Amino acid sequence: MAHESVWFSHPRNFGKGSRQCRVCSSHSGLIRKYDLNICRQCFRERASDIGFNKFR
C-alpha cells in the first residue's frame, strides 16, 4: 500500500476537515452562516461585493 493511498483514505463527510473556503480552500475560520462557506479573511475582502454593509 503506497503512502498516497493511505494519506487521504479516511472519509471526510463531517467535521472541520470536510468543509473548506470556496475562495482559498482554507479550513480555518469558516463562516457557514447563510451557507456562505467563506473563511473570515476572504469574507472581509469580499463583504461589500456580496452585499454586506458595516453599520458603525
Curated annotation (Swiss-Prot):
GO MF entry, a single one: zinc ion binding
Cofactor(s) the protein needs: Zn(2+)
Binding residues annotated for Zn(2+), in chain numbering: C21, C24, C39, C42
InterPro entries, A to Z: Ribosomal_uS14, Ribosomal_uS14_CS, RIbosomal_uS14_euk_arc, Ribosomal_uS14_sf
Organism listed in the record: Debaryomyces hansenii (strain ATCC 36239 / CBS 767 / BCRC 21394 / JCM 1990 / NBRC 0083 / IGC 2968) (Yeast)
Classification lineage: Eukaryota, Fungi, Dikarya, Ascomycota, Saccharomycotina
Family: Belongs to the universal ribosomal protein uS14 family.
Protein name: Small ribosomal subunit protein uS14
One annotated GO biological process: cytoplasmic translation
GO cellular component terms given for this protein: cytosolic small ribosomal subunit
Domain of life per record: Eukaryota
Keyword entries, A-Z: Metal-binding, Ribonucleoprotein, Ribosomal protein, Zinc
NCBIfam families per record: PRK05766.1
Cofactor note: Binds 1 zinc ion per subunit.
